[in-house]
Amino acid sequence: MLPPVAIPERMAENRKIREHIYIEGKYTSYNKKENGKSHLILEVKAETLLDGDGSADDENKIILEGYLCKPPVYRRTPRGKEICDLMIACNEYDLRRTDYIPCLAWWKEAREAADFKVGDFVKIIGRIQSRIYHKKLSGDEVELRTAYEVSIGRIIEHESGSKKDFVGELQEVSE
């Protein structure tokens, strides 16, 4: 399940429900206050909407660049998988707003990302994913929730201070 997609009405006209579509756009975030608590809401803002055929060209792919805004959290899952949570602040081109995107690195990338510091520049390629989890409320009350995040496939670039560390070739992913 992907996050909500905001499609301008002019683009949505004459579209069939459940039709394969190809969307290019921005992955954005905003805070929504609910019951006195703030929740990070993520959505795709469509800028291009084309007919898709369900082929590999229609794959779920995202390239993000930004700055680490929280310390990375490295851990092992109950099944032994190495993961590292990252929160990446992505500035809009005009610098008037910043989107905060939760990301998850796996295995080798998780070990590498565990040493990153707040303020480090990163460029990643990955995919948008969702997961359902149980949120314990008061007493025995449990609520099912959905979390959206970027699953990192590769860390393309990492810059700490004046040192740049190129982990992969950008040309490989921007075909």
Regions found by a protein language model. Give the residues of each.
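Single-stranded nucleic acid-binding surfaces, predominantly the OB-fold ssDNA-binding core
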Residues: 1-175
